[in-house]
Structure formats: C-alpha cells, structure tokens
C-alpha cells in the first residue's frame, strides 16, 4: 500500500469533497456568529442535536440578504464544501441563506416591523388627526393611473370644494421607493405655508405582491413617519396590508376608499344643515314663547304694586337723603371749625399782632393816667405802680409806688393797707 503524506491526503480529501459536495443544502441552527467589521464576511457554525459544521458567508453574498442573520435562527444554507488543505479543515461556503419555514423576505419584513415598533412608528399616540374639511390634498400616484381617475371622480362628487393635486410618482419597479420618498418630502415641504396640504395620500391600485412590495421598504416608512402633514396609505386592495399602511396616520383599503374616508359628503352635510335649521327654528320659537311669558308675568307683578308701596319707597329714599344731608352739614361745620382754629393759631403767633397789642396796652395805660389826672382834686396825686395807674384798694404792703401831679413826682413804699 502506498504511503501518503499529510499534504497528499489533505489534497485528495479536498478534491473529493469539493467535487462531491459542489452544491448542497444544509439545515441547522446558527451559532458562534461573527461578522468581520473590516472585510464584512460572516463566519458562523450550523448545528443540530448531534453535529456542527462551520460556514462562511462572504461580503458579496452577505449584502444580498434581505434580513439580518442572528444567533439561534433555524436556517437552510445553499453552498459548496470547501477544504483548507494546510489544516485539513472544511466548511460550507454559503451562496444563499433562507429561513427554514418562511421566506427571507418575510423574515426581513418581520425584523423591520419589530425595529419600527420599538421606535414608536405604529403607536396611536404618534398619529396625526384626520382633517375634518380638507381644502387641499396631495395625491402621490401615477398621473396616468386608473387610481388617480377614480379618486378625482369621487372627490368631485363628495366634496367639490377640495383641490386635489397629483404629484406624479413611479409606483412600482426599480426606482419606485426613491420616487415615493421624494414625493412625500415635496408635499410635506409646503407645511405651514399658505399652499400647505391638509393631507398626503399615497395611492396605488391592485397588483401582485411583487409589484406592491416596495411599500414595505423602510425608507418609505421613515418618510411617512417624519412627515408633519397628515398622511394616508391606500395601496392595493382590502386584502393587501403593507408596512406603509401601519406607519401612515390612516389606512384606506383602496384609493377610492381613501377619498370616501378623507372627504366629507356634501349631500350628507346639506341634509345635516337642513336638520340644524329645523332644530334652530324650533329652539328659537320655544325661547321666544318663554321670554314672552316671563315679560307678561313681570308686567302683572308691576301692576300689583300699590300706592302705599310706592309711598313707602319714596319715604325710604327721603330718609336716606335727609341722613346724607345731615352728614354733609356736620362735615361742613367740622371743616369750618378746623379752618377757624388754624386762622386763630396763625394770628396769635403773628409778630405784627403782638406789636399792635403791646402798643394798645400802653395807650390804654396812658389813657387811664390821663383820665386819673382829670379827676385829681386840687391837692391830690396820681398813684401808679410800674408806670401803670393803680387804685388804692389794689395796693398791698411792700409795693413801691409813684405819686405825681402837675407840679411834682415822688416815690413811696406801702407800709400797710387798711380797708375801709
């Protein structure tokens, strides 16, 4: 038997395995997943309850995956066995990877839904309210589509005062996602301007799931969620439910249904207005009768007022006026008294008045002296004290006095006073 070297046996194994297992499908659970940050290659193991095999997914194939590869996923990998002869290692070089029971697109969509759910894209609290009477609506659709024709027809019938503006958009195929995103951004750019739209409706008629799948794209979801203008998603038929339907503020089953939901019916509102008019007329008549009855009651009450009651009211008014007059009189007297006291105080402290008073006193004394002189007997004398005339009965012991007449003047001191 020929003896083989290690290199020879590994080379033969490599040739045999790679030729025999050129294309294989292997099912197992993903484990030990590592994604190289620089190269972008993914390295992992595929295992079942008894065995493990290593796998590699190179960057080019990894970029084509519709979903994120994660630990614990049950996958079916398609590829070929490759052997690294220097170490005798072998692995599966994966070309494609699919979930075991669901397609890769389905798994990718479920992962995207969970991502957006955590970001609040589906929360009712983040939804904008539907405008009650839209005046201007942007419709993102193909201007040559049957959907646009149906929407215009229904809008003109239901609410003709609303202006529908078609933003021509590619609604399927390559470039659809970018076209829809740009149209949403354009319509929303008018927000808070005089040409602002009250609503943005993304509309497309029915088709295959492949045709509609663009509306499951994350970029369209982002554009709808970030729009400041109220948005509606009306894609396909009733049975078609896409990611845009969940993210938009409101979903319509079809483009026509979007107009029926968004726009009020003018016929219904005319009927409502007629009903309001009837109710208003009835309410006015009822109120008029009530007010008339109330006025009649007041008139009867006024007639029942007697002359005595009127006289009593006048007496009360007179009493109030008398009290008020008395109060005003007392107040006037108090003010006058205060004013007089102030004037008296000012006069008593006036230097001019004091000078005049002193002069008047001197004149009075001189007058008394003159008068006394007139009454003097032939041998009598005028008695004065401190240059002021004084009567004898006013003197007391110790007083120093002056005696004077026309011929002489003398000083004396009172030794005693006898009362007669």
From Swiss-Prot:
InterPro entries the record matches: Exonuc_VII_L, Exonuc_VII_lsu_C, OB-fold_nuc-bd_dom
EC number(s) given by UniProt: 3.1.11.6
Keyword DNA-binding among UniProt keywords: no
Family statement drawn from the similarity comment of this UniProt entry: Belongs to the XseA family.
Subunit-level organization: Heterooligomer composed of large and small subunits.
Function: Bidirectionally degrades single-stranded DNA into large acid-insoluble oligonucleotides, which are then degraded further into small acid-soluble oligonucleotides.
PANTHER family: EXODEOXYRIBONUCLEASE 7 LARGE SUBUNIT
Protein name, per record: Exodeoxyribonuclease 7 large subunit
Organism: Helicobacter pylori (strain J99 / ATCC 700824)
Gene behind the chain: xseA
């Amino acid at each position: 038997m020929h003896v083989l070297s290690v290199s020879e046996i590994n080379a033969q194994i490599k040739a045999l395995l790679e030729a025999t297992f050129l294309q294989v499908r292997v099912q197992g659970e993903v484990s030990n997943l590592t994604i190289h940050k620089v190269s972008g290659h993914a390295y992992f193991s595929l295992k079942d309850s008894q065995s493990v095999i290593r796998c590699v997914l190179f960057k080019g194939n990894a970029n084509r995956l519709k979903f994120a590869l994660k630990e614990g996923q049950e996958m079916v990998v398609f590829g070929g066995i490759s052997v690294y002869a220097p170490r005798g290692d072998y692995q599966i070089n994966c070309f494609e990877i699919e979930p075991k029971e669901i397609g890769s697109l389905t798994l990718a969509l479920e992962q995207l839904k969970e991502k957006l759910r955590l970001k609040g894209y589906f929360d009712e609290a983040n939804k904008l309210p539907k405008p009650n009477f839209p005046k201007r609506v942007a419709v993102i659709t193909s201007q040559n589509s049957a959907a646009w024709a149906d929407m215009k027809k229904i809008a003109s019938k239901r609410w003709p005062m609303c202006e529908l503006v078609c933003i021509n958009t590619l609604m399927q195929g390559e470039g659809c996602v970018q076209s829809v995103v740009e149209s949403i951004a354009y319509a929303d750019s008018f927000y808070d301007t005089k040409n602002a739209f009250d609503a943005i409706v993304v509309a497309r008629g029915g088709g295959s799931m492949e045709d509609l799948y663009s509306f499951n794209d994350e970029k369209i979801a982002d554009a709808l969620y970030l729009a400041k203008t109220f948005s509606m998603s009306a894609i396909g038929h009733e049975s078609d439910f896409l990611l845009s339907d969940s993210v938009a503020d409101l979903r319509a089953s079809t483009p026509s249904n979007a107009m029926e939901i968004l726009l009020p019916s003018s016929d219904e509102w005319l009927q409502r207005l007629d009903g309001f008019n009837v109710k208003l007329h009835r309410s006015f008549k009822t109120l008029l009768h009530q007010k008339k009855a109330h006025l009649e009651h007041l008139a009867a009450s006024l007639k029942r007022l007697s002359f005595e009651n009127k006289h009593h009211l006048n007496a009360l008014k007179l009493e109030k006026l008398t009290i008020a007059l008395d109060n005003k009189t007392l107040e006037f007297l108090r003010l006058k008294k205060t004013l007089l006291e102030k004037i008296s105080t000012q006069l008593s402290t006036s230097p001019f008045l004091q000078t005049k008073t002193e002069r008047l006193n001197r004149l009075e004394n001189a007058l008394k002296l003159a008068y006394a002189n007139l009454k003097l007997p032939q041998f009598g004398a005028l008695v004065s004290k401190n240059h002021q005339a004084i009567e004898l009965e006013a003197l007391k012991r110790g007083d120093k006095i002056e005696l004077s007449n026309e011929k002489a003047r003398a000083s004396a001191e009172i030794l005693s006073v006898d009362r007669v």
